């Protein structure tokens, strides 16, 4: 009998293994999305064997407890540990900015050893595409808003074969709190909420424009799209007040609608974490403007929920989101929607399905669904 009877390799939210394991096949080739930063290995094996999983890339060798704050986020440990909560081994993938300049190649070794029965070894050769060609299609610029006295850096994708005689939908993608002080390029690198639409568009499917504004810190660290951080810090009575940066995004959007051939019946809005809060707030402020919403890991103001009536939306959240805890964010929001007759679709990942970095990171799954992207582009005012 083989030491390892079953091996599954999964990415966030997926129930399907990236490999079709055969104990007699010792090497496998896999490809993962550009915003994949961890793999979960689930094994069934003979308990007489010791399992060792290692990687030939520094960022793939360690787990949570190996992090040394003094050394930064990428100190290498010795081997990948087993995590009981996830019932598997978590192999981390590099997310430092230089790794996005070219495709990443990495070999993960899985060994089952026994003093009595010897050793079995398997290798998984991984490729992660960097999407550099797609990211280079986004042009960076800066919008100076005179009404709200803020500056909004942004990246804009326009199809390579843009024809002003046609009308194009536009997707507005709003990042979360962690991206306020990063380069815009990093936003495009580390999440697919913008590049996924551009990839489709470049192959002639769901052609569109994509706007990625950035919420820069102007006043203090509580600056965000909304008053979410102020609320968390006890400096606001609500997380739903729009900040000037978000109000300026609306002005920027109107400017682009005038400059480009935009189909105003098909303006779409998506956002993650605090950017998801902003999706709801912006849609409530302009309830007749947006044809569809994809809010991820966030919540809406229950007191104003009726303003969303008539706007199609597909909501994504994880049951074990440790930051936007569903019991006091998502659940009251859904109850208010049901009471107000607001229609929505919901994907609610069970605990443990989003395993890296935590259940909060549901956006590492939803934007890779062709069904989700096609659904959004099927909506129109």
For the regions a protein language model found, what residue spans apply to each?
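Primarily recognizes the serine-hydrolase "nucleophile elbow" in alpha/beta-hydrolase
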Residues: 254-308
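Alpha-helical scaffolding within the catalytic cores
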Residues: 188-201, 297-306, 331
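Beta-rich interaction/scaffold domains
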Residues: 1-130
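C-terminal catalytic histidine-bearing segment of alpha/beta-hydrolase fold enzymes
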Residues: 296, 314-323, 328-381
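Gly/Ser-rich "nucleophile elbow"/oxyanion-hole loop immediately N-terminal to the catalytic nucleophile
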Residues: 160-166, 224-273
